[in-house]
């Protein structure tokens, strides 16, 4: 049964002697191979040679401290709400008497976890934070053997005392 009345006539063209022995195809393939031989190699020897990161690269998270060493995070939860991967978990608590040197505001994050396996490193948490507490550094997230090691708590996230929180010049866009 014919569905259309269009038909195409196929002509069986006779191949020449050169086409039958595939010499032109072999020569053109060798020319392509030889042209790639003299181009710059894309592969680098990784441990010895490392490429520079892009200017806007986002790596490992840091919870920043202020000049007095107090945590900037006030557990407002905007970073967790803005995270499209739902990788951030926050539990808020009130600052107790005598903890003024540890936390900047009355409310602080008693639990702050980022699941690095879920995180897509989009930087929305950094942009949403009104206190500039969350910061994405240029540091790579190290490889681990267990999944639970990729859930970073405050022990891995809080900026160590006496270190700079701005190793790169990239600043997130804020209005």
From Swiss-Prot:
Its cofactor is [4Fe-4S] cluster. It is an enzyme of class 7 (translocase). It is a peripheral membrane protein. PROSITE patterns: 4FE4S_FER_1, 4FE4S_FER_2. [4Fe-4S] cluster 1 binds at residues 73, 76, 79, 129. It catalyses: a quinone + NADH + 5 H(+)(in) = a quinol + NAD(+) + 4 H(+)(out). GO terms for molecular function: 4 iron, 4 sulfur cluster binding; iron ion binding; NADH:ubiquinone reductase (non-electrogenic) activity; quinone binding. NDH-1 is composed of 14 different subunits. Subunits NuoA, H, J, K, L, M, N constitute the membrane sector of the complex. NDH-1 shuttles electrons from NADH, via FMN and iron-sulfur (Fe-S) centers, to quinones in the respiratory chain. The immediate electron acceptor for the enzyme in this species is believed to be ubiquinone. Couples the redox reaction to proton translocation (for every two electrons transferred, four hydrogen ions are translocated across the cytoplasmic membrane), and thus conserves the redox energy in a proton gradient. This is NADH-quinone oxidoreductase subunit I. The gene is nuoI.
């Amino acid at each position: 049964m014919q569905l259309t009345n269009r038909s195409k006539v196929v002509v069986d063209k006779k191949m020449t002697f050169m086409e039958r022995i595939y010499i032109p195809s072999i020569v053109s393939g060798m020319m392509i191979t030889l042209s790639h031989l003299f181009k710059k190699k894309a592969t680098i020897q990784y441990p010895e040679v490392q490429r520079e990161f892009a200017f806007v690269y986002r790596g490992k998270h840091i919870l920043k401290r202020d000049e007095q060493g107090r945590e900037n995070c006030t557990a407002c939860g905007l970073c967790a709400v803005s995270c499209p991967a739902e990788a951030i978990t926050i539990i808020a608590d009130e600052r107790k008497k005598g903890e003024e040197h540890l936390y900047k505001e009355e409310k602080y994050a008693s639990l702050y976890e980022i699941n690095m396996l879920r995180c897509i490193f989009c930087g929305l948490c950094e942009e949403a934070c009104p206190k500039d507490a969350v910061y994405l550094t240029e540091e790579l997230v190290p490889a681990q053997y267990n999944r639970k090691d990729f859930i970073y708590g405050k022990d891995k996230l809080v900026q160590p005392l006496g270190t700079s929180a701005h190793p790169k010049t990239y600043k997130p866009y804020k209005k």
